[in-house]
Amino acid sequence: MFAPSRRRVLEAVASSSSSPVVTLPGFLVPAFQQTAGAAARRNFSATTTRPSKLGRTPLSIPPGVEITIGEPFVKRDMTQWKQQPKRKITVQGPLGQLEMDIPDFIKIDHDAEARRATLSVANRDEKEQREMWGTTWAYLNRFIMGVSEGHTAVLRLVGIGYRATIDTRPEKEEYPGQQFVCLKLGFSHPVEMGVPKGMKASTPQPTRILLEGINREQVMTFAADIRRWRVPEPYKGKGIFVNGETIKLKQKKIK
């Protein structure tokens, strides 16, 4: 019925289908030896977790500056469902004292003899801890510099008739001896702004304002509040510039 060659092929297929054992070529065997558990544990990247570049840098503590680390405490906050233990860090120096709260997973190794402080975290693999590692280092570095040297901000008033003076307003002061920055910026009335507590303001020139304080965030926030009255505009270049700020001038559109 079938040719001899076709009959032999059909018999070989029938005999192979009845056999339950299937053998693989030797070059395919290593590819199937990996277990499912090992494949599931394999990460997308095989590189190790890199620590924070800032956080692992030791902080240098100048003479006259002391750092005090408080005990862990839990601050009740109704806006957060998870209560995170924190520690209070106090930095005291010749110019004043600053305090901040840091998470409990950040450890500070303070060497008083070597005048150094090193920061570390409990788990480097967690993203939140890596982020707070460098952020806490930056805040501590600013606090140490603030209580030892202080922070400054210089504002330049550019514009015809723009002037600034430092006066006192006993009827408006929020604390004894508060200074007020009085600005003439082309409005129909002068602008008066009270200097926050812990800061000093002076005018070396009528068009220059010098702000000094130990808290950099407070100094730059008050400088931004003053700048908001006359934001630099790009056509005439007039406005209030902070710390060497520049602006690219635009050409007027001529119809």
From Swiss-Prot:
This protein's major location comes to mitochondrion
Q: Name one GO biological process term.
A: translation
**What segment(s) does the record annotate as region Disordered?**
39-61
Any one GO molecular function term: rRNA binding
Its Gene Ontology cellular component terms are:
mitochondrial large ribosomal subunit
**Where in the cell is the protein located?**
Mitochondrion
Which InterPro entries does the entry link to?
Ribosomal_uL6-like, Ribosomal_uL6-like_a/b-dom_sf, Ribosomal_uL6_a/b-dom, Ribosomal_uL6_bac-type, Ribosomal_uL6_CS
The source's superkingdom equals: Eukaryota
Which keywords does the record carry? Answer: Mitochondrion, Ribonucleoprotein, Ribosomal protein
Recorded hits in PROSITE patterns, A to Z, give:
RIBOSOMAL_L6_1 (PS00525)
Function text: Component of the mitochondrial ribosome (mitoribosome), a dedicated translation machinery responsible for the synthesis of mitochondrial genome-encoded proteins, including at least some of the essential transmembrane subunits of the mitochondrial respiratory chain. The mitoribosomes are attached to the mitochondrial inner membrane and translation products are cotranslationally integrated into the membrane.
Belongs to which family?
Belongs to the universal ribosomal protein uL6 family.
- Quaternary structure annotation from Swiss-Prot or TrEMBL: Component of the mitochondrial large ribosomal subunit (mt-LSU). Mature N.crassa 74S mitochondrial ribosomes consist of a small (37S) and a large (54S) subunit. The 37S small subunit contains a 16S ribosomal RNA (16S mt-rRNA) and 32 different proteins. The 54S large subunit contains a 23S rRNA (23S mt-rRNA) and 42 different proteins.
The molecule here is called Large ribosomal subunit protein uL6m
Native organism is: Neurospora crassa (strain ATCC 24698 / 74-OR23-1A / CBS 708.71 / DSM 1257 / FGSC 987)
Give me the gene this protein comes from: mrpl6
